[in-house]
Amino acid sequence: TNALAKEKFANVDSLQEALNTGFSRLHYLFPDWEIPAKVYLFVSGFNSSVIYYENIIGVGTDMYLGSDYPYYNQVVYDYQKQTMRKECIVGDIMSMYLSYHIAYNSKYNRLLEQMIFRGKQMFLLRQLLPDEPEWEIIGYSQEQWNWCELYERAIWNRIMEKKDLFKTESLVLSSYMNDGPFTAEVTQDSPGRLGQWVGWRIVNSYMRNNKEV
């Protein structure tokens, strides 16, 4: 594992360039936020992908060896391997950093509120990483992203039919918002975390129609 990690991360120029772009844009939007002083690569023993401590970011390179890395079959589920690629590192770092600075706070903790919160994060990530494909930002494959776009109306019909938007039950929230092989509340053909995708669509629609924001 150590040897493979060193090989795959021997050249990190593109990673560094993308991070510089992301944090430069972040500093422009939030000048009071402290930009991380260092980003370290390390082998985590398959325990950590991205960590943030005392203004230092650590990236567990053994968590990004590629979705086809054979050993992953022994330690993670198939659906988790999609995000265990080098291409996902920048999005994971920026997402973790935003979560550290922008806490979720809701009086009722309804599904719609969680959707919109995550949608705002995704929208902001898109502004910070304009060159990243949208599916990479949310951690989908391009095929999963295309499925969501193709069946967007059916997704909404299902959500409204079940009256899920204002539910607060933990099982419902978990099904829509947490990682999994699919979003059980919608269909087994869907990708997981479909609530995050829906939230992003809501925020995108709002921002398109309210350009003064």
Where are these regions (language model features)?
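Short, charged low-complexity intrinsically disordered segments located at boundaries
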Residues: 51-59, 153-159, 186-193
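C-terminal soluble interaction/assembly domains
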Residues: 166-213
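Residue-level preference for alpha-helix termini and adjacent loops
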Residues: 8, 58, 62-63, 158, ...
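Acidic/His/Gly-enriched intrinsically disordered linker/tail segments
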Residues: 122-183
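Acidic/His-rich structured neighborhood in mature extracellular/periplasmic domains
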Residues: 2-145, 213
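Non-transmembrane alpha-helical segments in soluble domains
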Residues: 27, 125, 156, 160, ...
